[in-house]
Each structure stands twice: as structure tokens, then as C-alpha cells.
Amino acid sequence: MTLFFFSLGTRSFIDTESICNSRNVIENIYSNNNNNNNNNNNNNNNNNNNNNNNNNNNNNNNNNNNNNNINNNNNSNNNNNNNNNNNNNNNNNNNNNNSSSFEYSPTKFNLQY
């Protein structure tokens, strides 16, 4: 930074207004840079938070889908088991109805020859 001196006779004056203005410009640049950095950091943090939230939501959705699939499979297995049990019961009933319970005894029938 250049300092300007004005000589009037034996006295020298420093242009303090120019110095103050230059200093203010530099301070504003630093301040703006800091603000920009803070804004960038905040934006990055927000983006990271959003990404984390999205990942958590995706994980929750995947877990829910997996649980639904497990429940559907369990329900399907239960239905199949119930159907098998019903079929077995029907087969047992049919077998019982078709089976003969005749016991041969010569004295049971009075046969005329």
C-alpha cells in the first residue's frame, strides 16, 4: 500500500483518508470472504444433512419392503399349510367313508341254501 505525503513547507501530511478507505476496502474483502466461506460451509452442511436424511429414508423404505415381503411370504406359507391340512383332512374323511368295517362271522347271517 502506497502512502502519499504532501509537503507544505517544513510540515508533511499523511493522506489519512486514503489510508482509511483502503483499510476499509481490505476489511470488507476479508469480511465478504469470511461470509462466503460461512455460507459455503452452511450449504455443505445442509447438503450433507439432506443426503443423510435421504439415505435414512431409503433405508427405512427398504426395511419396510423387506418386512412386507417377509410377512407376505409367511402369509403365503400359512395359507399353503392350511390348504394342505384341509386336503389331508378331506382325504382322511374320504378314506374313512370308503373303508368297510365288515367283520365276517358265520353266525351273523342265516343263509338258506
UniProtKB/Swiss-Prot annotation:
Q: Where is the composition biased (Polar residues)?
A: 99-113
Where are stretches of biased composition, namely Low complexity? Answer: 32-98
Q: Specify where the region named Disordered lies, as residue ranges.
A: 31-113
Q: What is this protein called?
A: Putative uncharacterized protein DDB_G0283431
